[in-house]
Amino acid sequence: VIVFCLVNTYDKLKLHEIHLRSIARAIPLCYAYDFHLALYDFPFWKNVREVVEDVVNYTTIGDPSYAYTLLEGNRIHLIDSFPAHFGDLIATTPNPDRKKALSFEEMVRVISERSTTFLIGLGRRGLPKDLMERARYHFEATGRGVSLETCTAMGVVATTIHFARVIGWRR
């Protein structure tokens, strides 16, 4: 299982448009690449059906059927901790800790051997320090330490994971 996890680093007290739009942009990526979508530290909803309804009703990004397909397949998760079955945590960052840095080649191996959760921080601040420390690996997607806008990073990371998985299947 591969989990694409959006980490709320914006406001935790009030739902903002950026929350909904980021989720709306992640849904088609998860649908296309057969990932689960986890939302970490999003206290605005009681259940995932509320999330899907709010995203579908508020945004015009993507085909709503993708969200409902993920929902019906139990592939959207509201979490405030990381269940063991989500596997290894992989922080996405332009500044990986050298000791935790995960190369593309290593990613191919890791995702073919076990479940993984890729953490994507929303906003300029990136992932909180505690999650960076908890993550088993750090993945830098550009190969050059370039900081990307959040939704651009989501697309790059999702596509990179997909290609790593395809390569792993062929080995």
Please place each PLM-identified region on the residue numbering:
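Structured adenosyl-cofactor binding patch, chiefly the S-adenosyl-L-methionine
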Residues: L127-R171
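Well-ordered, non-membrane alpha-helical segments in soluble/globular domains
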Residues: H19-R25, F104-V108, M154
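Long, charge-patterned amphipathic alpha-helical coiled-coil/hairpin "stalk" segments used as oligomerization
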Residues: T93-L131
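Short, well-ordered alpha-helix to beta-strand connector turns
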Residues: D34, F86-G87, R114, R134-R136
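RNA substrate-binding interface of SAM-dependent RNA methyltransferases
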Residues: V1-N95, H162-F163, W169
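Short secondary-structure transition/capping segments
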Residues: R49-E53, S103-F104, T152
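Residue-level signal for well-ordered alpha-helical segments
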Residues: V7, K12-K14, T116, D130, ...
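Secondary-structure boundary/capping motif
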Residues: K14-L15, N47-V48, K99-K100, L127, ...
